[in-house]
Amino acid sequence: SFHQHFQKQDRGRLIMACGTGKTFTALKIMEQQTKGEGLALFLVPSIALLNQALIAWMTDATVPIRPICVCSDAKASRKRVQLDDSNDMAVVDLARPATTDIESVVQQLHQASEAGGLTVVFATYQSIDVVSKAQAILNESAPGSCVFDLIVCDEAHRTTGVTLKDSDESAFVKVHDNDFLPAAKRLYMTATPRLYTEDSKSKAKEAEAILCSMDDPAIYGEEVYRIGFGEAVDKQLLSDYKVLVLTVSDRDIPPSLQKSITNGEMEINTDDAAKLVGCISALSKRMLVDEELLKGPDPEPMRSAVAFCSTIKVSKQIASLVEEFGQKYYDALDEETKAEVV
């Protein structure tokens, strides 16, 4: 469907639920558009996603890809182990060296053009200026020599937003401008399209601001394909799930454990202790709900959980306490309850 769409249009939207294969689908669209030769750009909002896309495309490509990585973080090619709250994502090791040096990008693009074949620039939106300047240098010396056959905008909902009059565009919005980033085709893909209300659009127009909303075909093109979560479950592409909402209080903490917390024998407060008790109960499927509803499809306890914390410091603290607290909680239970707990 994208092949037919791109014969008449130069922009299109791909809406796919998480886990249904957006990255792989985009690869196949790119291969179809380039026929195994040419130049493509894959834009992502983070270094981690860049690495993920790079590895996925290099692994699944049917023809060899010459990758060029343009990343806004000069340290992206080496591992930073320490994490702090000012940088909530570890800078990962990239599968290929990254650069933000314009001359280096120009040289790599020129060499790729001379060699032929398929070249893909993997870049973060934040480094889009580097890509644009490299393109401009090459096109100035040889007009039209560096035009992307396809730009893939991953997490395209990040490219929406408002640009006020007389203010600079954000790096995420610049991708829409074909003068800034020349390309034959643009593919916008996301699981969560961001749309603005008619009221927001009217206010932006009154303020002479530019509003990028994903239902604007002039910016994003038509929606070519969509598969939501429900349809993906029906097609057995994704597993269905249930949401369990449970309430816990300090009364759910055994008295002996409460005493240890009160006396400062454990580095955890009552509130966090109650949350951990709730987590253990949920994993054990010990809740006051219909037993058949909860355990009927799968009577076994759950074995893993994801906990969200306010800061990295807190998450590290909780992670270090889980085993100790879990064991003390288990020891404080009666024998009948112990048999029900993971």
Predicted regions span which residues?
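Interdomain helical connector at the RecA1-RecA2 junction of SF1/SF2 helicase-like NTPases
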Residues: 198-329
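Pre-Walker A (Motif I) flank of P-loop NTPase domains
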Residues: 7-13, 38, 119, 301-304
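Conserved Walker A/P-loop ATP-binding site and its immediately adjacent core
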Residues: 37-62, 67-80, 125-127, 310-313
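Pre-Walker A adenine-sensing motif
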Residues: 1-7, 292
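Walker A/P-loop
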Residues: 8-30
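SF2 helicase catalytic motif II
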Residues: 126-127, 140-188, 193-194
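Hydrophobic anchor at the beta1->P-loop junction of P-loop NTPases
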Residues: 14, 42, 307
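Conserved helix/coil segment N-terminal to the catalytic DExD/H
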Residues: 103-147
